[in-house]
């Protein structure tokens, strides 16, 4: 549970979490818009919005017009409320390409794209920056995490050694060449 992970006894009043799966796709986006407006004025700002499953806001990730409309609306809301909107979108199976027109549009507008992948060490996963608008993704540390049975959750395991970072730079350059 979120509170246990954050080592907090109680949920702060400002933290809101909603399950929108019982709504139609159009109602989901409207609920996000309305709640952002409400909570912006109620709390004097919004620190972060997380949409876990942005593909659930559209009928088809391959519908260009619908994808552009949803991303434009989220981009507009981020600007109006001066906040970060973090969107989760899965890659196509066995690839590093985001799904459909939705993925393409999200890549175009995103300030940062992070990827969570299996590490060479099979019990760990690694978080990699694929895009950083004001910098190089190669300058962002590779963060490791793994399932901890005792804690009952994934835990941070540190950064990959500097040598790994240098190997990544070399691999990226070879792939570009």
Tell where the protein language model's regions lie, with residue ranges.
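Conserved alpha/beta core segments of nucleic-acid transaction machinery
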Residues: 31, 134-177
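Conserved inter-motif catalytic segment of the P-loop NTP-binding fold
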Residues: 1-62, 149-150, 160-161
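Phosphate-binding/switch region of NTP-binding enzymes
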Residues: 48, 56, 65-155
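Generic low-polarity alpha-helical segments
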Residues: 1-3, 17, 106, 172-177
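Alpha-helix initiation/capping motif
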Residues: 21-25, 99, 166-169
């Amino acid at each position: 549970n979120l509170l246990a992970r954050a080592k907090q006894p109680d949920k702060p009043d400002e933290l809101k979490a909603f399950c929108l799966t019982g709504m139609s796709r159009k109602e989901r986006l409207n609920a996000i818009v309305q709640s952002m407006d409400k909570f912006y004025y109620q709390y004097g700002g919004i620190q972060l919005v997380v949409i876990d499953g942005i593909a659930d806001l559209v009928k088809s990730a391959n519908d260009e017009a619908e994808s552009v409309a949803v991303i434009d609306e989220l981009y507009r809301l981020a600007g109006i409320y001066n906040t970060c909107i973090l969107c989760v979108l899965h890659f196509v199976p066995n690839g590093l390409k985001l799904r459909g027109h939705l993925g393409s549009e999200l890549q175009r507008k995103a300030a940062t794209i992070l990827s969570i992948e299996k590490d060479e060490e099979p019990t760990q996963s690694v978080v990699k920056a694929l895009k950083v608008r004001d910098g190089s993704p190669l300058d962002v540390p590779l963060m490791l995490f793994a399932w901890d049975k005792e804690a009952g959750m994934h835990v941070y395991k540190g950064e990959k050694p500097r040598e790994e970072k240098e190997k990544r730079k070399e691999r990226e350059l070879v792939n570009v060449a």
